[in-house]
Amino acid sequence: MISKSSPLIFERSKKDRYAYSLPQNDIENISIASLLDDKYIRKHKAEFPEVSELDLVRHYTELSNKNFGVDTGFYPLGSCTMKYNPKINEKVARISGFSESHPLQEEEHVQGSLEIIYSLQEELKEITGMDEVTLQPAAGAHGEWTALMIFKAYHEKNGQSHRDEVIVPDSAHGTNPASASFAGFKSVTVKSNQRGEVDIEDLKRVVNDNTAAIMLTNPNTLGIFEQNIIEIGKIVHEAGGLLYYDGANLNAILDKVRPGDMGFDAVHLNLHKTFTGPHGGGGPGSGPVGVVEKLASYLPKPMVIKDNDRYKYDNDIPNSIGRVKPFYGNFGIYLRAYTYIRSMGANGLKEVSEAAVLNANYIKSRLKNHFEIPFNQYCKHEFVLSGTLQKQYGVRTLDMAKRLLDFGVHPPTIYFPLNVEEGMMIEPTETESKETLDYFIDAMIQIADETKNDPDKVLEAPHTTIIDRLDETTAARKPILKFEELKDEKYKEHTNIDSEDN
């Protein structure tokens, strides 16, 4: 009954089969037509799947056994910080006083929740070196957009509305130019130098009177620390622009150096990365934004403040860009992040970064004789290697990533950043053991050897997974997003087969 490819729950459906019987209704039946306008009433019976309770349980248990996550295997997905999420976080998030509270309750009834929000704001201010922090943004890109809208409001307030350009490095996350566009800015690219850092001369070339900001990650997406960050800040600030810190790589510098100390005016953090909020399955995430004093009056409202021994919402933010997320934001992630920060303490967070950097450099050192390493200096928490050596045997980085699946390892990020040919970005995080790192390294070395001696083994990978190579082109151009579309597609397949047989 269980096959490699699981049928959809709709395909398991059998008419009049059900999992649960409702008790007999002793309330008078009222026609829904008497309660709702006709336009809201379904014209046809909903096509819900009809399955037994046992089939229902088996279906979702089967699917869950096919999931892959940090709890099941190594997940070195570069720029994503797929670290272990401590289970104490889940215990705290399930405390009934938090999990059963309602965002519309009166302030005096949710003092505990407001205290968590306020306390987390204070912790993040200290960690980042910012003067104020809002927790509202729902994820990293939302945080980017929020910060850029603050920049935009600041420039407009100061008679600088002509500033419509945001500088992004050629190694930047794709969300950076996308967020700039959503905020109404144009993106201008600054090149990297031979060391993988921002090219200072090119920066001087692109900075002008229209520069609103520069968006940087430090360490950058190549895993390299921008040693000239103070000079970069001086160049942009003297031109009237602002510095924005993309917090995707904060895991490398905790309690070592703070964005505020590097001269950044705003920062977003990923609580679902650095601070162990789970981010598998698409979310929920959380992307708090911190700003320096001159931008504090532009933050989204309300803020949570402490008034003597009570916590309350503060809507008195004169230049606020307005609310960017309903109610508290993603409060459950706040709880997990706050638990993590308080559990680790300052020394623990410092050790996090030290171990993350050590692990990345250990892998890089052991792989340098088997793969092209574009940048030879010590990396921070991640690094990028190139598959150009393997390409001469007809094997690409994509093929090697597929082969890694046979070893029970989630592939690293591939073909990113864009300025490395056949790039593979590896971020092991601090939570992995040396034994796990060695297993991954040995797998990579074996794959490198196979590309020379048995390339077909790599080209035809994966060999052990439920699904092998996807037809990604067709999936992108002709996506099947609804069960009705799947039925239509299967009908076409059967029709074509019948035609060929005849």
Curated annotation (Swiss-Prot):
Cofactor needs: pyridoxal 5'-phosphate
InterPro entries: GcvPB, GDC-P_C, GDC-P_N, GDC_P, PyrdxlP-dep_Trfase, PyrdxlP-dep_Trfase_major, PyrdxlP-dep_Trfase_small
NCBIfam families: PRK04366.1
Annotated protein name in UniProt: Probable glycine dehydrogenase (decarboxylating) subunit 2
Lineage start: Bacteria, Bacillati, Bacillota, Bacilli, Bacillales
Similarity comment: family membership: Belongs to the GcvP family. C-terminal subunit subfamily.
N6-(pyridoxal phosphate)lysine found at: K273
GO cellular component, as recorded: cytosol; glycine cleavage complex
GO BP term, pick one: glycine decarboxylation via glycine cleavage system
Subunit structure: The glycine cleavage system is composed of four proteins: P, T, L and H. In this organism, the P 'protein' is a heterodimer of two subunits.
EC number: 1.4.4.2
One Pfam short name: GcvP2_C
The keyword Nucleus is assigned to this record: no
Function in brief: The glycine cleavage system catalyzes the degradation of glycine. The P protein binds the alpha-amino group of glycine through its pyridoxal phosphate cofactor; CO(2) is released and the remaining methylamine moiety is then transferred to the lipoamide cofactor of the H protein.
